Amino acid sequence: MDPHPLTWALVLLGPALALSRAPAPAQEAPEKLCGHHFVRALVRLCGGPRWSPEDGRAVAGGDRELLQWLEGQHLFHGLMASGDPMLVLAPQPPPQASGHHHHRRAAATNPARHCCLSGCTRQDLLTLCPH
């Protein structure tokens, strides 16, 4: 029997066997992120328009610009629903009886509200990045 095929088989199958025996990566636990914590996590992962750490502006001023950017992504209502008083820019309209079910459905599908109530993983937040 020729030893070369056995050697090649071990060389080719060795790494595959080693990888199959390696422990599976631990699944990331969802983290509850509400209000400005949610905004900051998004900025940390995605960045924002004209927003960078090198910018000389105060961080507090950047939140308003970020909220305007997120408003286009339909996340603003979820931030307001989280109850963070620092992020509420305008009074909310009074609830209407006819739109109650629509409001509940919109809140259930809102990513900001979902991250606040149930938690989000890093991968969940990356799906919200505009780029």
UniProtKB/Swiss-Prot annotation:
PANTHER family: INSULIN-LIKE 3. GO terms for biological process: adenylate cyclase-inhibiting G protein-coupled receptor signaling pathway; positive regulation of epithelial cell migration; positive regulation of wound healing. GO terms for molecular function: hormone activity; protease binding. Heterodimer of a B chain and an A chain linked by two disulfide bonds. Transmembrane segments: none annotated. The keyword Signal applies. It is found in: Secreted. Belongs to the insulin family. This is Insulin-like 3. Seems to play a role in testicular function. May be a trophic hormone with a role in testicular descent in fetal life. Is a ligand for LGR8 receptor. GO terms for cellular component: extracellular space. Its main location: secreted. Keywords: Cleavage on pair of basic residues, Disulfide bond, Hormone, Secreted, Signal. Disulfide bonds join 34-116, 46-129, 115-120. Residues 1-26 form the signal peptide. Residues 58-103 form a propeptide.
